[in-house]
A protein has these predicted regions:
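Glycine-centered hinge/linker elements that transmit conformational signals in sensory
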Residues: 124-126, 166-195
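A structural signal for short loop-to-beta-strand junctions that line the ligand-binding cleft
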Residues: 32-36, 40-43, 71-106, 135, ...
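Short, solvent-exposed loop/beta-turn-alpha elements that line the ligand-binding surface or hinge
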Residues: 62-76, 131, 136-144, 158-179, ...
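Hinge/lid segment of periplasmic solute-binding proteins
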Residues: 28, 48-97, 112, 121, ...
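Conserved C-terminal helix/tail region of periplasmic/extracytoplasmic solute-binding proteins
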Residues: 107, 312-367
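Extracytoplasmic/periplasmic substrate-recognition and gating elements
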Residues: 87, 108-109, 177, 188, ...
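Conserved N-terminal structural module of periplasmic/extracytoplasmic solute-binding proteins
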Residues: 1-54, 113, 195, 245, ...
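Extracytoplasmic/periplasmic solute-binding protein
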Residues: 88-90, 97, 121-168, 211
Length: 367
């Protein structure tokens, strides 16, 4: 289930011997508990901005300054993720969701590259009458984290703010309603089972020629040209995420590596050396297009173009530093589906999401 860059990194780590890796899309849910055990169930953890914040707040990851001084003099400043002056993670790549589309189909139909969601909808409507693909659009709308992330991307793209004074929620507004309406409009051109669609599901829809466009993680781009599993090699173009009213409707992320605090210094020393083997230049040269790497040796190719264009078009960083964001993301992931399926209208869905957030935020002391 892991995306290609993590497969590359963990394979490089395995060359050290005595290294076992678990690749799980739901890693964030198990990692916090695994790191809290003493000794930790894992010594090395793969993280993104959001998962990193959870571990920092839990106090279960080890400062890396001593190990960076000993083994990491080659690391770039952009790779050293610091909190209060201490290095707590080593970043290896940047990531965002951006538009991927079947360039061959768009050319055959005389359609221009979509720049907005309205462009996507117009292209999908036109395409549908030709019956070229099963569904014109794919979407990572799986109920839970993925669906919450779709709202976050589009709400920020429209200039939305999640919180007011004292961490109070602030999504039940015109921007929130517009965001929901855009999301629902896109579902009309998706597989009706879109609420089970995670990144792997949408990647496979693309590879099997079932969809013509989707906003998908940049780390999935290289898989489109993997001849062993893709029927659309050379046909999927990478482009910027659709523009919202304020900026590209996506969030910028980093992925990297942390060490658990609940292990011995000797184990940490060994684990860090394994990490350095996993994210070295040799690995990048062998897997250049698997990610937008922060590691020396990386050369940006066509697979990275969409991620780079999305960043250029102003995509906001995922707001993981906001204290209430974890609870907000969870409430969104659990609550947006009721609007998409017609169970609730937009205002009711947003009010209920805010209410769920308030309960969680009150219980945790944020409000």
């Amino acid at each position: 289930a892991g995306f290609d860059s993590w497969k590359a990194v963990t394979s490089a780590m395995a060359e050290c011997g005595n290294v076992t890796s678990t690749l799980d899309q739901d890693f964030k849910d198990v990692q916090a508990d695994a790191f809290a055990v003493n000794p930790s169930l894992y010594q090395i953890g793969g993280v993104n901005n959001s998962a990193f914040s959870i571990l920092v707040n839990a106090g279960t990851i080890r400062p890396l300054d001593d190990l960076v001084a000993k083994y990491g003099s080659h690391l770039k400043p952009s790779q050293l993720i610091k909190v209060n002056g201490q290095i707590l993670a080593i970043a290896m790549q940047v990531n965002n969701q951006h538009l991927m589309y079947r360039e061959d189909i768009f050319k055959d139909l005389g359609l221009a590259e979509p720049k907005t969601h309205a462009d996507m909808l117009a292209a999908a409507k036109f395409m549908q009458s030709y019956n070229i693909v099963d569904y014109p659009i794919g979407g990572t709308y799986k109920a839970g984290w993925n669906l919450g992330e779709e709202f976050v991307n589009n709400y920020l793209g429209n200039g939305g703010e999640f919180f007011g004074e004292g961490n109070a929620p602030s999504i039940n507004n015109a921007t929130g309603v517009a965001t929901l309406n855009t999301m629902k409009a896109l579902t009309e051109y998706m597989d009706p089972e879109y609420l089970v669609g995670d990144s792997t599901y949408v990647q496979q829809q693309f590879q099997q020629g079932k969809i013509a466009m989707a906003t998908l993680w940049g780390t999935r781009a290289a898989a489109m040209d993997n001849a062993e599993e893709s029927t659309v090699v050379g046909k999927v173009k990478m482009a910027s995420a659709p523009m919202g009213t304020s900026r590209a409707a996506a969030t910028n992320w980093w992925d990297g590596i942390v060490l658990a605090s609940n292990m011995t210094d000797e184990q940490a020393d060994t684990a860090f050396r394994v990490v350095m083997e996993g994210i070295d230049t040799e690995m990048v040269l062998a897997n250049n297009d698997a990610a937008v790497w922060l590691v020396d040796g990386y050369v940006a190719g066509s697979a990275a173009q969409g991620a780079l264009d999305t960043a250029t078009n102003g995509a906001a960083p995922y707001p993981s530093s906001l204290a209430g964001m974890g609870a907000m993301h969870s409430a969104l992931g659990n609550g947006v589906g009721a609007f998409l399926t017609g169970e609730k209208d937009a205002a009711t869905a947003l009010a209920d999401i805010e209410a769920a957030y308030i309960i969680a935020a009150t219980e945790s002391g944020l409000m």
